[in-house]
Regions:
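DPxDG-like acidic metal-binding loop motif
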Residues: 1
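C-terminal nucleotide
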Residues: 4-14, 18-154, 162-179
Length: 179
């Protein structure tokens, strides 16, 4: 928490704690957030697995397609549509994602990634459509969603497209889960 506070000191829009938690907790984790717990900045509940079979399976079906860095001047928070129905859909998709991973169910994992992408687009449309983004990022993502069981962007405005598939997309990298 001290590192998080130091990293975000004085920022109007602090970064989320998801990346920090991903570095600290081993294995595969589900992070649940609740606005009534520490203002929603830290998980209210964390569920993790280090099951070797699940880890090996996930490493075999998740592929990262590089997008490049965020463009200068990019701000995904310009438009915020905090519609409770979409927020619930995003939370449900996150829970379904973790359940699909633990069950080693590629189709369900793909569906959860696609649903997460749709929810993020509704809640924060500038993630995909911002004046500083070159090209049609949402269209690119839709192409991966149509060709593979599922896909979503790893971060706002840059990073990677995460693809769930038995076969690696061209130019993709594999992941490694730290246990």
């Amino acid at each position: 928490r001290e590192l998080y506070e130091a990293e975000n000191e004085g920022l109007t829009d602090p970064s989320g704690s998801q990346d920090m938690c991903g570095l600290i907790y081993p294995g595969i984790s589900r992070l649940d957030y609740d606005a009534s717990v520490e203002g929603g900045w830290f998980p209210s509940h964390i569920e993790s697995t280090c099951d070797p079979a699940v880890v090996t399976w996930l490493e075999s079906v998740i592929h990262l397609v590089p997008l490049g860095p965020r463009p200068d001047g990019y701000n995904p928070l310009l438009t915020r549509n905090m519609d409770p129905a979409w927020v619930k859909r995003l939370g449900d998709a996150g829970a379904a994602c973790y359940d699909a991973i633990v069950a080693m169910d590629l189709a369900a994992l793909g569906d959860s990634l696609n649903e997460s992408s749709r929810a993020w687009r509704a809640i924060l449309p500038n993630i995909y459509e911002h004046e500083t983004i070159k090209g049609d990022l949402w269209g690119l993502l839709e192409g991966y969603m149509a060709e593979y069981p599922g896909a979503m962007q790893s971060g706002c405005g840059g990073g990677y497209i995460i693809v769930a598939s038995d076969e690696p997309p061209a130019g993709s990298a594999r992941i490694s889960v730290r246990v």
